[in-house]
Amino acid sequence: MKKYLATLVILLVSSFATVSAQTWGNPYSGNVKSASQQQASITFKNKSDYTMTLKIMKEYGGVYSTVVLSPRSSRTVSFSSTSSYKLKIKAVHNGIASYHDGGNFSVTCNEYEWTEGTMEFMLSTYGSGLGPRISAKEFESNY
């Protein structure tokens, strides 16, 4: 009986080790990640003296994530599936806010490819640089 239990334990341990070692991606390109690591990511960088709030909106409405960036800071957001998003930006400096349409972007995340990128934001006192202006009401809307 002890020999049977020891064999069963060894088989169970071996099967768990095999599952955790599975990889995804193209092994010929060198872009191979384990299943537990597979996520797309975008790093948002604020290269200005403004505090920025980024609302990442889902393609058909609803907030995916809200990111607050202090002046000259960055933050990485992870995505677990392929989708399209809309970006809304609120920039605040000396208590004065401006609101902007940051445009649309897409993220790819599947077993063969995934997005890893950077978006940088710069706002100067001489011009926008963040996209067309929108109203505060439009920024607050979740559509």
Describe each model-derived feature in a short phrase.
Residues 4-16:
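Sec-dependent N-terminal signal peptides
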Residues 21-60, 65, 90-143:
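Primarily secretory-pathway and cell-envelope proteins
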Residues 44, 80-82:
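Mature, secreted membrane-active peptide modules
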Residues 65-71:
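Short beta-strand segments within Ig-like beta-sandwich modules, predominantly Fibronectin type-III
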Residues 71-72, 82:
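Tight coil/turn sites that cap or link beta-strands
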Residues 73-77:
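Short strand-edge motifs at loop-to-beta-strand transitions and within beta-strands
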Residues 84-87:
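A short tyrosine-centered beta-strand micro-motif
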